[in-house]
Amino acid sequence: MTEQQDKKKILIVDLNNIWNKYLWVRKGNFPDTISAILHLFRSIYREKEFSKVYIVVDGKPCEKYDEYKEYKSNRKHNPDKYIPMKVLSSVLSQYFNVVGGKHVEGDEVIAFLATRLAKKADVYIYSNDKDFLQLMQYGVKEVTNFKKGHSEVIISEEDALMKFKNNKGKPLKQLKHILPYRVFKGDTSDGIPSACKGMYDKDIRHIVEKCWIYKEPYSEDLLLRIIGKVEDDALKETLIKNINNINRNYKLMSLIDIPDSFKSNIQKIWYKLDVAGLNEYVQQKDLYQW
């Protein structure tokens, strides 16, 4: 048996993303959403495709929000979801590793686990969030759909690169280009503006394909060296004027530079099975008693 065949499969779930996806399809109906999600995870548990499953819940991050007030400020705050999410987590923690951190984003926890575990296992992230596509350069896979407990739709390298095609349909060339390209473009869904307003897409692609330095950890000194490789004087001047914006966007968007010390932020979360709470949302006991 080959080394690739020997590798265990590990699933990391972006629970907040899955909750929002299922809730939107069910037009905000909490009982239907909880039942559907429990049905999904019961199937995943029974099918045993993955040797280990991590369910990641969001904490209340401070640093990013404190430093940049617009970060994710365009998202609707829905306090009503926290009670059903806790009820849902009370079931999932009986069967899976539910993890999170009080003052860190779920995305950071997912990225930390994925990049470390991918060194010895085949790691799959269940989410529809494009933020995780930057991790594909490390062999991490993103699953966007399950069918009968099995991973059904896995984003290919070609599909990932096509998500960042230009108006002529030209995709990015390599997976490592995704992060710096997004840094320059920004992400309106997270309230992150373009790092260099008005910069042409062709100039951004030139920078990430020809000038960006990928073999060293990102820093402002590295950025200055990258800018030094740009031959066009006008483009170089634009980059110099926007150094602070580029640094800001990189800090907000990068999931590849999380230090080993981040591990101390991750906690295993376990709730006693909330049967009373479940009875308000779920009619079938077999959906939470597997």
Feature annotation, model-predicted:
Residues 2-4, 27, 50, 73-281, ...:
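Extended two-metal-dependent nuclease catalytic cores across DNA- and RNA-processing enzymes
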Residues 2-94:
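Domain-level signal for Mg2+-assisted phosphodiester chemistry and nucleotide/NA-binding surfaces
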